[in-house]
Protein backbone atom coordinates (compact mmCIF):
# COMPACT_ATOMS: atom_id res chain seq x y z
CA UNK A 1 0.00 0.00 0.00
CA UNK A 2 1.35 3.42 -1.00
CA UNK A 3 1.84 5.96 1.78
CA UNK A 4 0.80 9.26 0.21
CA UNK A 5 1.39 12.49 2.09
CA UNK A 6 -0.97 15.26 1.11
CA UNK A 7 0.62 18.65 1.78
CA UNK A 8 -2.78 20.05 2.72
CA UNK A 9 -5.64 19.45 5.13
CA UNK A 10 -8.21 20.85 2.69
CA UNK A 11 -10.96 18.22 2.16
CA UNK A 12 -11.57 19.20 -1.49
CA UNK A 13 -7.89 18.66 -2.29
CA UNK A 14 -7.59 15.43 -0.28
CA UNK A 15 -10.66 13.99 -2.03
CA UNK A 16 -9.13 14.74 -5.44
CA UNK A 17 -5.81 13.14 -4.47
CA UNK A 18 -7.42 10.00 -3.03
CA UNK A 19 -9.73 9.53 -6.02
CA UNK A 20 -6.92 9.98 -8.55
CA UNK A 21 -4.50 7.63 -6.77
CA UNK A 22 -7.25 4.98 -6.48
CA UNK A 23 -8.02 5.29 -10.19
CA UNK A 24 -4.38 5.05 -11.25
CA UNK A 25 -3.03 2.48 -8.79
CA UNK A 26 -6.21 0.60 -7.84
CA UNK A 27 -8.91 1.03 -5.24
CA UNK A 28 -7.51 0.84 -1.73
CA UNK A 29 -3.90 0.94 -2.96
CA UNK A 30 -2.94 3.97 -0.93
CA UNK A 31 -3.24 5.56 2.45
CA UNK A 32 -3.48 9.37 2.50
CA UNK A 33 -1.91 11.23 5.40
CA UNK A 34 -2.61 14.94 5.38
CA UNK A 35 -0.17 17.43 6.86
CA UNK A 36 -0.29 21.19 7.16
CA UNK A 37 2.84 22.80 5.73
CA UNK A 38 3.81 26.26 4.56
CA UNK A 39 3.87 27.21 0.89
CA UNK A 40 6.44 29.98 1.20
CA UNK A 41 4.29 32.19 -1.04
CA UNK A 42 1.46 34.62 -0.18
CA UNK A 43 -1.89 33.16 0.88
CA UNK A 44 -3.20 34.21 -2.52
CA UNK A 45 -0.46 33.54 -5.08
CA UNK A 46 -0.49 35.50 -8.32
CA UNK A 47 0.89 34.13 -11.56
CA UNK A 48 1.83 30.67 -12.69
CA UNK A 49 5.41 30.87 -11.42
CA UNK A 50 4.50 31.92 -7.86
CA UNK A 51 1.70 29.35 -7.67
CA UNK A 52 3.93 26.52 -8.91
CA UNK A 53 6.62 27.58 -6.44
CA UNK A 54 4.05 27.31 -3.65
CA UNK A 55 3.18 23.74 -4.65
CA UNK A 56 6.83 22.75 -4.96
CA UNK A 57 7.60 24.29 -1.56
CA UNK A 58 4.72 22.41 0.05
CA UNK A 59 6.01 19.11 -1.37
CA UNK A 60 9.51 19.87 -0.09
CA UNK A 61 8.17 20.75 3.37
CA UNK A 62 5.98 17.63 3.45
CA UNK A 63 9.00 15.49 2.51
CA UNK A 64 10.95 16.97 5.42
CA UNK A 65 8.04 16.31 7.79
CA UNK A 66 7.26 12.77 6.55
CA UNK A 67 10.40 11.46 4.78
CA UNK A 68 9.26 7.82 4.95
CA UNK A 69 6.31 8.32 2.55
CA UNK A 70 6.10 6.87 -0.97
CA UNK A 71 4.56 9.99 -2.53
CA UNK A 72 4.18 13.64 -1.58
CA UNK A 73 1.43 15.70 -3.23
CA UNK A 74 0.64 19.41 -3.17
CA UNK A 75 -2.08 21.43 -4.84
CA UNK A 76 -1.64 25.19 -4.87
CA UNK A 77 -4.40 27.44 -6.19
CA UNK A 78 -3.59 30.82 -7.68
CA UNK A 79 -4.78 33.70 -9.83
CA UNK A 80 -3.38 34.30 -13.31
CA UNK A 81 -4.74 36.37 -16.21
CA UNK A 82 -8.02 37.13 -14.39
CA UNK A 83 -8.64 33.42 -13.76
CA UNK A 84 -8.24 30.93 -10.95
CA UNK A 85 -6.27 27.72 -11.49
CA UNK A 86 -3.94 25.42 -9.58
CA UNK A 87 -0.63 23.62 -9.88
CA UNK A 88 -0.31 20.01 -8.76
CA UNK A 89 3.13 18.72 -7.83
CA UNK A 90 3.75 15.04 -7.02
CA UNK A 91 7.07 13.52 -6.07
CA UNK A 92 8.37 10.13 -5.08
CA UNK A 93 11.96 9.21 -4.27
CA UNK A 94 12.94 9.18 -7.96
CA UNK A 95 10.89 11.71 -9.91
CA UNK A 96 8.42 14.56 -10.06
CA UNK A 97 5.17 15.03 -11.95
CA UNK A 98 3.51 18.41 -12.39
CA UNK A 99 0.30 19.57 -14.03
CA UNK A 100 -1.67 22.78 -14.23
CA UNK A 101 -5.43 22.57 -13.81
CA UNK A 102 -8.15 24.01 -15.96
CA UNK A 103 -8.72 27.74 -15.46
CA UNK A 104 -11.89 29.55 -14.50
CA UNK A 105 -12.34 33.19 -15.53
CA UNK A 106 -13.41 35.24 -12.52
CA UNK A 107 -15.96 38.07 -12.54
CA UNK A 108 -14.63 41.62 -12.17
CA UNK A 109 -16.41 42.11 -8.83
CA UNK A 110 -14.49 39.16 -7.36
CA UNK A 111 -11.16 40.05 -8.99
CA UNK A 112 -11.34 43.59 -7.65
CA UNK A 113 -11.35 42.36 -4.05
CA UNK A 114 -8.65 39.76 -4.71
CA UNK A 115 -6.42 42.41 -6.28
CA UNK A 116 -6.93 44.54 -3.15
CA UNK A 117 -5.23 41.79 -1.14
CA UNK A 118 -8.04 39.45 -0.10
CA UNK A 119 -7.74 35.72 -0.80
CA UNK A 120 -10.25 34.21 -3.22
CA UNK A 121 -11.77 31.79 -0.69
CA UNK A 122 -12.88 34.44 1.82
CA UNK A 123 -14.09 36.71 -0.99
CA UNK A 124 -16.22 33.86 -2.36
CA UNK A 125 -17.54 33.09 1.14
CA UNK A 126 -18.62 36.73 1.49
CA UNK A 127 -20.19 36.67 -1.97
CA UNK A 128 -22.09 33.39 -1.53
CA UNK A 129 -22.66 33.17 2.22
CA UNK A 130 -21.06 29.69 2.20
CA UNK A 131 -18.57 29.34 5.07
CA UNK A 132 -15.14 28.03 4.06
CA UNK A 133 -16.21 27.63 0.44
CA UNK A 134 -12.57 26.95 -0.50
CA UNK A 135 -12.77 23.71 1.47
CA UNK A 136 -15.94 22.76 -0.43
CA UNK A 137 -17.09 23.42 -4.01
CA UNK A 138 -15.08 26.61 -4.40
CA UNK A 139 -15.58 29.36 -6.95
CA UNK A 140 -15.59 26.66 -9.62
CA UNK A 141 -18.71 25.05 -8.17
CA UNK A 142 -20.49 28.39 -7.87
CA UNK A 143 -19.70 29.73 -11.34
CA UNK A 144 -20.28 26.42 -13.17
CA UNK A 145 -23.62 25.93 -11.39
CA UNK A 146 -22.26 22.77 -9.79
CA UNK A 147 -21.27 21.12 -13.08
CA UNK A 148 -17.67 21.14 -11.84
CA UNK A 149 -16.27 21.53 -8.35
CA UNK A 150 -12.93 22.53 -6.98
CA UNK A 151 -12.26 18.86 -6.24
CA UNK A 152 -13.27 17.63 -9.72
CA UNK A 153 -10.93 20.09 -11.43
CA UNK A 154 -8.11 19.17 -9.04
CA UNK A 155 -8.80 15.49 -9.71
CA UNK A 156 -8.04 15.90 -13.41
CA UNK A 157 -4.80 17.74 -12.67
CA UNK A 158 -3.70 15.06 -10.18
CA UNK A 159 -4.35 12.36 -12.82
CA UNK A 160 -2.19 14.32 -15.28
CA UNK A 161 0.60 14.86 -12.75
CA UNK A 162 0.61 11.11 -11.98
CA UNK A 163 1.36 10.22 -15.62
CA UNK A 164 5.16 9.90 -15.14
CA UNK A 165 4.66 7.45 -12.27
CA UNK A 166 2.80 4.74 -14.17
CA UNK A 167 3.92 5.14 -17.78
CA UNK A 168 7.28 3.60 -18.68
CA UNK A 169 7.88 6.07 -21.50
CA UNK A 170 8.61 8.77 -18.87
CA UNK A 171 11.50 6.74 -17.43
Curated annotation (Swiss-Prot):
Q: Its catalytic activity?
A: XTP + H2O = XDP + phosphate + H(+); ITP + H2O = IDP + phosphate + H(+)
Q: How is the cofactor bound?
A: Binds 1 divalent metal cation per subunit; can use either Mg(2+) or Mn(2+).
The Gene Ontology biological process annotation of the record reads:
nucleotide metabolic process; thiamine metabolic process
Residue positions annotated to bind Mg(2+) are 38, 68
Alphabetically sorted, this entry's keywords are: Hydrolase, Magnesium, Manganese, Metal-binding, Nucleotide metabolism, Nucleotide-binding
**Could you state a single Gene Ontology molecular function term?**
ribonucleoside triphosphate phosphatase activity
Question: Where would one find coiled-coil regions in this protein?
Answer: none
Give residues annotated as binding substrate.
Answer: 8-13
Concerning Pfam families, the annotation shows: NTPase_I-T
Q: Note the superkingdom of the native organism.
A: Bacteria
Which InterPro entries has this protein been placed in? ITPase-like_fam (IPR029001), Non_canon_purine_NTPase (IPR002786), NTPase/PRRC1 (IPR026533), YjjX_NTPase (IPR050299)
Instruction: Give the EC number(s) under which this enzyme is classified.
Output: 3.6.1.73
Q: Which cofactor does it need?
A: Mg(2+); Mn(2+)
Subunit structure of this chain's protein: Homodimer.
Q: What does this protein do?
A: Phosphatase that hydrolyzes non-canonical purine nucleotides such as XTP and ITP to their respective diphosphate derivatives. Probably excludes non-canonical purines from DNA/RNA precursor pool, thus preventing their incorporation into DNA/RNA and avoiding chromosomal lesions.
State the NCBIfam families in the record. Answer: inosine/xanthosine triphosphatase, PRK05074.1
What the record says about family reads: Belongs to the YjjX NTPase family.
Q: Which HAMAP family match?
A: Non_canon_purine_NTPase_YjjX
What is the name listed in the Swiss-Prot or TrEMBL entry for this protein?
A: Inosine/xanthosine triphosphatase
Q: Which organism is it from?
A: Citrobacter koseri (strain ATCC BAA-895 / CDC 4225-83 / SGSC4696)
